[in-house]
Amino acid sequence: SYMPHYEQIVLRINPKEASQFDLVIVRGSRVYTSNRDRPMPQTPPPFAMVLRKYLKNARMTAVRQLGFDRVLALDFDTKFGAMHLYVEVFREGNIILVDDEGIIIQPLTHAKYSGRVLKKGVQYAPPPPANDPHDLDEAALSEIFAKSERDLVATLGGKANLGGTHANAVCELAKIAPNSAPGDVKVKLVHEALSSLLGSLANDAKGYLILDTEGDQTPEPVSYTHLRAHETG
């Protein structure tokens, strides 16, 4: 384990039948693999030393996502028993090493949020679970719409956790204007469009590179109808 700088952690992965690579974790931002050499500090930070102590020669057994949240759990089999490294990939997120009973061994930073505390020796509590669009039925959508003060596309993107691109795709499939008031739309049409989109993502996903009018590139898993004006084949 290395920390090139305070909010970046590098785990050296050595697969049995492949070349080694680095798993790079940037606090609150992203997780990716890399083969690039990085300058490392001569004196490892305390959190890096903790990771080395507990994860040295450990075997990674699983990588999991907690529900629909932007939280990854890296599971390890170590000489100390099962360990878990939780990576919170959202603004003000943390990186937390936890034992098999859920007790925090060490967080990257000690923090206190509404409803949870991240510090050594306490039970790890993930953030409150986000809405999973796969679990939203018509009744749940109706409740979300009734409480929303934003337009339809913003409500779907935020409260239903679809994000902007997928929220616009649902509006297009439902043939409803994105700026419609949620209370004025037929929930059944929105739910049918949402189910159709999620089905496409699960079963028909292909890679597309979509160019906007200024030439910027955005990778997407399916070809959305509201973006087809920019498709080049």
At which residue positions do the language-model features occur?
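Extended, highly charged segments
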Residues: 1-228
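A short, hydrophobic C-terminal helix/tail in secreted or cell-surface proteins
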Residues: 229-233
